[in-house]
C-alpha cells in the first residue's frame, strides 16, 4: 500500500528542457500541472475530512439534546439509527479518511513533489553556461534549488489541503449555526470579516519581508559555503578573523531581515488573539441569551460553543498556514531569479550530432569579448589540419584559454564560425561536440567520488583492463594503490574529497591525464596539462602523451615553452590576435614575441611571463 501511494508521483520524469516561467503563478503551474490528479484527490479527502470534523460537534450537540430528554428503557431503541450512524462516522469513516489523507500527503506529495521539482530544476540549471556559475556562489545556487523545491511543495499542499479545509470547515459551521438559529451566525461572520481585514493588512507585508529574508539567507549560505570550499586559502593567509567578519556581516543582515519578518508575524498573532476573544465571548453570550429566551436548545449551545472554541484554536494554525504560504511563495520568488534564467548557450532546435572523421578545425574570423564592447579575441582566423599538433603561445591574457573555451562551446561567439570537419559547431549538439574532444586543464577539479568513478567519467563503458592500462600510461598506479580515505576505502575505491582536495596537484593531474587517455577522443586539448607535475614525472609520462597525441588533432597551451617546442606548429597570440606562426626554429630566427619569451625563460625569468 505504501509503495503504491509513493509511486503516484515519479521523482524522475522525462525532462523536456524548457525554461521554467519567470512569473510566480506560471512557475507553480509548470511544476504542479503534471501531478494534478494527486492534488485533486488530496483536495477531496480534505473536503470530506473537514465535513466529518464539523459533524463531530453536531453529534455532540445532538447527544446533549438526547440526554436532556426523559430517560427510558427504550432510549437506545429510539435513537439506534442516529447513534449507529455517529458510531460509524467516528470509528470507521473518520480513521479511513485520516489514513487516506495522510497517505496522499506524507507518502505521495511530500517526498514525491519536492524531489521531482528539485530534479527538474537541477536538470535545467546544470545546463547553464560557465558564466552563470562564475557569477554566483555555488552554495547559493544549490540552496535555491533545494529550498525552492521544498517551498513549492509546502505552499501547494497548504493551498490545496489546509486552505480548502479551512473554507469548508467554516462554511459548514455557518450552516449548522443557521440550522439552530440564524442569529448565531452573526459573531462568526463579524469575526470572518475582521480576520479578512487582518490578513489583507498583514499578509502582503509578511510576503515581502519573507522574500527579503530568503534572499539574505541565500547570501549567507553562499558566503559560508564559499569559505568552506576555499578553506586552504583561508588557512594559508591566516585571515580567519577577516573571514569571520565577512560571514558575520551576512548573518547579521539575515538576522535583521528575519526580525523584520517576525515583527509582522507577532503583530498579526496579537491582533488575532484579541479578535478571537470577542468571537468566543460574543458567541457564548448570544447562545445563552437565545437559550434563555427559548429559541435554541442546550445542544445548540454545546454545538456553538464547541465550534467557536475549535475555530479559536484553529485561528493560530490558520494564521501560520497563510503566513507560511506567503513565506514559501517568497522563497519560490527568490528561487525563480536564479532558476528561471534563459540558457545563454543552448542547442538549436535542428542541432545534429557532430561527426568527426579526420579532426580538422577551422576558426573563421571569430570575435568574442565576454559580452563587453571589445577585446579578448577579435577577428581571429586559424586552420588546424587533421592530425596536426599546434601549440598556443603568448603572455597571460592573450586569449589562449578563451580560444579553447569557444572551441568547446562553453561560450557562444559574438560573430564568426568554428568548423570541425566542415561542420559549424553552432549547429551540432553540445554533448556530441564535447564527446569528441579530450581536455586536460591546468586547474584539474575532480568529483568527490572514488578514483574509479572519476576515471570512468572519461569513458563510462571502459573495462577494468582498459582503465588500469590508462592509469599505467599516466604513471598513476603507484600512488593510487596506496590511497586510503576516511571511510577505509582503498585504491580505486578511495574517495578523493571535494574537488580532489585529498590528492596533491600532481596526483590530480595524472588522474586527469589517465581520464583523457581512457576517453581517447580524436581531438585533444592540453591547457597546461603538465604544469602541476615535477620534471621527473613530466619526463616519465611524456612518452605516454606522445602516444596519446598520435593520430589526433592537438591544441596545446603552455607557458613553459620547452613542453610544446616539438609541436608541428606554434601559434603566438597577443591581445586576442595571432601575431606569429611557425616552428620553434622559425620563430626564434624571426626574433619576435616568441623569441623574447623564449629568451626570458631560458635566461631564468620564467616567472615574468607566468
Regions picked out by a protein language model, each given a short descriptive name:
Residues 10-21, 52-61, 65-68, 90-134, ...:
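Juxtamembrane helix-loop junctions of ABC transporter transmembrane domains
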Residues 1-53, 67-87, 101-109, 113, ...:
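Membrane-integrated ABC transporters
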Residues 34, 38-48, 93, 158-212, ...:
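Transmembrane helices of ABC transporter permease
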Residues 354-610:
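ABC-type nucleotide-binding domain
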Residues 216, 239, 263, 311-340:
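Cytosolic ends of transmembrane helices, especially the final helix of ABC transmembrane type-1 domains
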Amino acid at each position: 500500500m505504501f509503495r503504491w501511494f509513493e509511486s503516484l508521483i515519479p521523482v524522475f520524469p522525462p525532462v523536456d528542457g524548457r525554461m521554467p516561467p519567470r512569473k510566480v503563478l506560471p512557475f507553480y503551474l509548470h511544476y504542479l500541472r503534471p501531478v494534478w490528479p494527486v492534488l485533486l484527490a488530496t483536495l477531496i479527502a480534505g473536503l470530506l475530512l473537514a465535513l466529518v470534523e464539523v459533524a463531530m460537534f453536531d453529534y455532540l450537540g445532538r447527544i446533549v439534546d438526547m440526554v436532556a430528554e426523559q430517560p427510558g428503557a427504550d432510549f437506545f431503541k429510539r435513537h439506534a439509527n442516529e447513534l449507529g450512524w455517529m458510531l460509524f462516522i467516528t470509528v470507521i469513516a473518520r480513521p479511513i479518511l485520516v489514513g487516506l489523507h495522510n497517505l496522499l500527503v506524507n507518502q505521495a506529495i511530500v517526498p514525491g513533489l519536492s524531489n521531482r521539482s528539485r530534479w527538474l530544476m537541477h536538470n535545467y540549471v546544470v545546463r547553464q553556461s560557465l558564466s552563470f556559475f562564475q557569477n554566483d556562489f555555488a552554495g547559493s545556487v544549490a540552496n535555491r534549488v533545494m529550498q525552492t523545491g521544498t517551498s513549492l511543495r509546502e505552499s501547494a499542499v497548504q493551498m490545496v489541503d489546509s486552505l480548502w479545509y479551512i473554507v469548508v470547515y467554516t462554511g459548514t459551521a455557518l450552516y449548522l449555526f443557521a440550522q439552530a438559529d440564524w442569529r448565531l451566525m452573526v459573531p462568526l461572520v463579524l469575526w470572518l470579516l475582521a480576520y479578512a481585514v487582518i490578513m489583507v493588512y498583514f499578509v502582503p507585508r509578511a510576503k515581502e519581508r519573507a522574500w527579503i529574508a530568503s534572499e539574505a539567507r541565500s547570501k549567507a549560505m553562499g558566503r559560508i559555503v564559499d569559505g568552506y570550499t576555499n578553506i586552504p586559502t583561508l588557512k594559508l593567509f591566516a585571515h580567519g578573523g577577516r573571514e569571520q567578519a565577512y560571514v558575520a556581516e551576512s548573518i547579521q543582515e539575515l538576522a535583521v531581515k528575519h526580525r523584520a519578518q517576525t515583527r509582522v508575524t507577532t503583530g498579526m498573532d496579537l491582533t488575532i488573539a484579541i479578535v478571537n476573544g470577542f468571537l468566543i465571548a460574543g458567541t457564548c453570550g448570544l447562545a445563552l441569551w437565545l437559550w434563555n429566551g427559548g429559541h435554541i436548545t442546550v445542544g445548540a449551545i454545546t454545538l456553538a460553543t464547541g465550534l467557536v472554541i475549535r475555530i479559536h484554536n484553529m485561528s493560530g494554525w490558520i494564521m501560520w498556514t497563510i503566513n507560511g504560504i506567503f513565506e514559501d511563495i517568497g522563497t519560490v520568488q527568490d528561487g525563480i531569479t536564479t532558476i528561471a534564467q534563459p540558457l545563454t548557450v543552448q542547442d538549436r532546435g535542428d542541432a545534429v550530432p557532430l561527426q568527426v572523421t579526420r579532426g580538422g578545425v577551422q576558426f573563421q574570423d571569430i570575435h568574442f569579448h565576454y559580452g563587453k564592447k571589445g577585446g579578448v579575441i577579435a577577428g581571429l582566423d586559424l586552420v588546424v589540419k587533421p592530425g596536426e599538433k599546434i601549440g598556443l603561445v603568448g603572455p597571460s591574457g592573450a586569449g589562449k584559454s578563451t580560444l579553447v573555451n569557444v572551441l568547446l562551446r562553453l561560450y557562444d561567439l559574438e560573430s564568426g564560425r568554428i568548423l570541425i570537419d566542415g561542420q559549424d559547431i553552432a549547429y551540432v549538439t553540445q554533448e556530441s561536440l564535447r564527446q569528441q574532444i579530450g581536455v586536460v586543464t591546468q586547474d584539474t577539479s575532480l568529483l568527490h567520488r572514488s578514483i574509479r568513478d572519476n576515471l570512468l567519467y572519461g569513458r563510462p563503458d571502459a573495462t577494468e583492463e582498459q582503465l588500469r592500462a590508462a592509469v599505467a600510461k599516466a604513471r598513476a598506479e603507484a600512488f593510487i594503490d596506496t590511497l586510503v580515505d576516511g571511510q577505509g576505502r582503498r585504491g580505486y575505491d578511495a574517495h578523493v574529497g571535494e574537488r580532489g582536495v585529498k590528492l596533491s596537484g600532481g596526483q590530480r593531474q595524472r588522474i586527469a591525464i589517465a581520464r583523457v587517455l581512457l576517453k581517447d577522443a580524436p581531438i585533444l586539448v592540453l591547457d597546461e596539462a603538465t604544469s602541476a607535475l615535477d620534471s621527473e614525472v613530466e619526463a616519465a609520462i611524456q612518452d605516454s602523451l606522445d602516444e596519446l597525441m598520435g593520430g589526433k588533432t592537438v591544441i596545446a597551451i603552455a607557458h613553459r615553452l620547452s613542453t610544446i617546442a616539438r609541436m608541428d606548429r606554434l601559434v603566438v597570440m597577443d591581445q586576442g590576435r595571432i601575431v606569429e606562426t611557425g616552428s620553434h626554429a622559425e620563430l626564434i630566427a624571426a626574433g619576435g614575441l616568441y623569441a623574447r619569451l623564449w629568451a626570458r625563460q631560458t635566461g631564468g625569468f620564467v616567472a615574468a611571463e607566468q
